[in-house]
Design a protein with these regions (language model features):
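Residue-level detector of anion-binding/catalytic polar loops
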Residues: 1, 67, 176
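N-terminal positively charged helical leader segments and presequences
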Residues: 1-33
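Fold-independent oxyanion-binding glycine-rich loops
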Residues: 7, 48, 115, 134-137, ...
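Short connector loops at helix/strand junctions that flank enzyme active sites
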Residues: 11, 21-23, 37-41, 149-151
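RNA substrate-binding interface of SAM-dependent RNA methyltransferases
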Residues: 29, 33-132
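Short, acidic/turn-prone active-site loops that include or flank metal/cofactor-
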Residues: 31-32, 159-160, 182-185
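Active-site/ligand-binding-proximal alpha/beta "capping" segment
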Residues: 125-168, 175-178
Length: 206
């Protein structure tokens, strides 16, 4: 028997009936299982990092329970793709999401937003709920914040972080700057540390 999921929250038990060169035919058996998603609805706004680092962020963010990942071109992003190359990369990230769901037992695929520039996203998204900016020089730690409700956005920069202009735009849009301790973290470490801490404080890690 194998387990199959539809990406929308449902998992089935199945048995393999036929194996062909290009397909496998399964017979669905057993009860339908609806798996619970995390109670904390997190959207990760991730400044696009270099290939292997971005893959790691996407993979681990899924395991840590994000509901949505929004890739953003930022001033310090070291890779800028267009056209077919961007489409190929987006399909690759979608594959990383599917593989991560298979590994961690999630039956609902997190959304992968259409890649856009940071400024375009800021101008086109006003219904965000509480928003947090990972900012090493902030004086505010997560422990000082009140529980924000069940829907939040987390903004993490690429290698080198956000530029001064990008930080100013985030703060003017209502983002709250937070630090993750006294050490400067790599982009992949910062995003994942923030997600784990938020799930511990406000989500299903507790």
């Amino acid at each position: 028997p194998v387990s199959v999921f539809d990406g929308k929250g449902c998992e089935h038990r199945a048995t393999v009936k036929t194996i062909k060169r290009s397909e496998i035919i399964l017979e669905i058996a057993g009860a339908l299982t609806v798996l619970q998603e995390p109670s904390l609805d997190i959207t990760l706004l991730q400044g696009i990092a270099r290939n292997d680092r971005m893959d790691l962020i996407v993979q681990k963010a899924v395991e840590l329970g994000v509901n949505s990942i929004q890739p953003l071109w930022m001033q310090r992003s070291q890779t800028h793709l267009k056209g077919s190359r961007l489409e190929k990369r987006s399909k690759h990230w979608q594959g990383v999401i599917i593989s991560a769901c298979e590994q961690c037992g999630r039956a609902t695929l997190p959304d992968l937003g259409t890649t856009m520039t940071y400024s375009d996203w800021m101008l086109s998204n006003n219904d965000r709920g509480p928003c947090f900016l990972l900012q090493p020089d902030s004086k505010t730690g997560l422990g000082a914040l009140q529980p924000p409700g069940n829907r939040i956005h987390v903004l993490a920069g690429p290698e080198g972080g956000l530029s001064d202009d990008e930080q100013m735009l985030a703060r003017s849009a209502g983002f709250i700057g937070i630090h993750l301790g006294p050490r400067i973290l790599r982009t992949e470490t910062a995003a994942l540390a923030a997600l784990a801490a938020m799930q511990t404080l406000w989500g299903d890690f507790n």
